[in-house]
Amino acid sequence: MENKIQLSKDEIIMGFVASCVEDVADTLCVDYSEAYQRMDAVNMIEEYIIPNYEVLHSESRKNVTEGLIDTLKRWEESV
């Protein structure tokens, strides 16, 4: 008998958020913690990624990452 781990919707979304932070960090050639701190400073995770999860997770990884970087830079400029 095969035991499968069942993840909650929140766990799935948090996994997606983590992958977004990792991809932004890799693309910008910065540490994961720096990318997270920048995104957190403008509330991007709570105000953009989580509320738009359904749309974002259906996009290609490349488009999501490019969009996140563009959004991050615009939001940082407006602070």
Where are these regions (language model features)?
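C-terminal alpha-helical interaction appendages
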Residues: M1-V79
